[in-house]
Amino acid sequence: MPQVVSMINWKGGVGKTTMTLHLAAGLATRHNKRVLLIDLDAQCNLSFLAIGASSYITHAYNKNGPTLKNVFDNYFAHAPTIAANIILQKQVRARAGKIYTQVGIILSHQELTLLDMKLAREKRSGRDHREETKFEIEKLSVIKAIIDEVASDYDYVLLDCPPNVNLVTQNAFFASDYYVVPAIPDFLSTVGISLIKKYMDQFNSDYTSMWSYAGLPGTYVDTKFGGIVFNMVDEYGGGPKDGHRQMIQSTISQQGKSSVFANYVTDGDGISAAAQMNLPVFAYSDLPRAHQNAEKQANYMGQVVDEFVTRII
């Protein structure tokens, strides 16, 4: 069974989507792992980064190709979804003219913006409250059902969550073994981490109770906290600058040393230069104008990937 990980932060601009893509790339190249990416955010940023905006538009709009929207459309229509037909294989760009053969992706769609309201309105009447609870669990299990269908094909599944706790995000949590919080070392990025953990503890408790009450086989397995990984860290003299170092230390003091990745990703123009070409920063040899910074960021990102493997087990 794959390790399923939700990437979440309620604060935008922390590099969550970039981190998700690079974890997949690093897991594939550094650790020879098979990875499935799922873009749950209606902004579609992971989809754009992974295959390129023009390729995405051609696939999702010009050709009306499958996206996550089709999965939920089938749920509302009480129709089955064949997971293999939704996943794009050998489309995630590795470098100029090359793709990752071990990374698949389920693309997002902008119409997912309205999905949460539609899910909230979806009510199925049961013979009793227990059966209605089963129906509520089905609503939370749409993503999990897709993952379970292709579980033997992947070692990791990474879910890029929107910055909220709506029913789409709850679908991701329900399916996940872990959740990881990308952050930048500033107050606004880190202030909500305790609240995220509080909500996750509550979700775990609620889901456990629902599962038991519905009389489903087995037990619900909690989604565990995988850690906080810092991104866009300014360095000086071989370590974080004072302001960023203090914020990282403050987070460690509040959350515990084991809650924070020992490795981080530095700030620089390498990742942004790579993103403009729809490439991961690991393709730094294709980025002559930002080669030095890109190579440095690639090395730091690689260390984060290696630590991720030791944490998510």
Task: Describe each PLM feature range.
Residues 1-313:
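P-loop NTP-binding core
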